[in-house]
């Protein structure tokens, strides 16, 4: 057992990032307190603080593995709770332009899981509740992070839903609030600059509903229908979730939000680039109303660039970098950040002051994963000329390289596995720059001209 190195740590937010962070801290502090403004449901249910819960959430294989490092055996917990197993390369039908009817099906040797956001939160929360020194206080809102006289973190001020105010002391505070405003407010209150920001304005609007899975044989469990951008931005997702249900989503960019009824929703599905999803659901029983959600921009707050990092404050998950949800990276990066935090604390266990310099070490360690996920989504986002933000100078070359990589992956199973490994954040993007692979991709690019 690792000896605790601090008396109390406080985590703001009980989403996936906050729960995973609490598990990472549990072996290094006497007490860990999670503070959550929402009332925490006892079962599988959405909560007000996560309005996106009614829409598909992807836990990439990299995120699943990070959670397994924090909670050994949690993949089996997810399966026991009803999550749908997905064999990599076999059970997902990817309908990409130029690869009709779909990208080749191959067994890539790993299994992921599909489930609703409320289910994965419930399963992770139950594992956290089994940690004896972790407490979850719901219906409690952090009003401020408290500063010590030297500008370091001293604790938090919070208020319950009935107006009871209190101050909790802490050696370490983690802002996993999603919005990230407690940390930003603390920086301002202590006279520190705000982190630089990079944003990509995508203006995505979602419409999602749920269907009972009808009888029938299919050679897929999950479908992704990608449009021919920029002519169209209408993307379709059909994802299996617990309870023998399909969650079906339509996303569009730069369109006015609307509140479609089922007839309008089905019409949007019918107008996808391929008929696969429409044919699957046209006679299926709808189980829910249509839910809407808007996502204006991806936002990366560059805490790694701050010179004056306050001792005792870490920011992770969406509070540090909010990714375009179309690519399913958010929960995975949050889990990976929590896992590397656990590794950092273990590495520092023998140090006289294991928390000294932890902040900079954490941001430096997290940077490659965050940067990789950001770069994987940035190039395809900028295919749409209406996307706001600074376009990479090498955008056209990157898009041509990506197209060549896809053609090579369709023909070569090893490249296919590497490509999906990078997308699932289990392989570094640097592997795509292997000289031999680059030469083969460049040959594909030349053939396409």
Regions found by a protein language model. Name each.
Residues 4-35:
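N-terminal Rossmann-like FAD-binding beta1-loop-alpha1 element of flavoenzymes
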Residues 24, 44-94:
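N-terminal FAD cofactor-binding segment of flavoenzymes
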Residues 38:
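Residues in the short beta-alpha loop(s) of Rossmann-like NAD(P)-binding domains
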Residues 58-59, 107-126, 176, 182, ...:
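Short beta-strand to alpha-helix junction loop
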Residues 97-117, 155, 250-253:
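Helix-loop-beta segment of a Rossmann-like dinucleotide-binding subdomain
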Residues 114, 244, 256-361, 365-369:
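FAD/FMN-dependent oxidoreductases across multiple families
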Residues 130-268:
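Predominantly flavin-linked oxidoreductase catalytic cores and closely associated redox partners
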Residues 342-449:
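C-terminal helical "tail/cap" subdomain of flavin- and related membrane-associated enzymes
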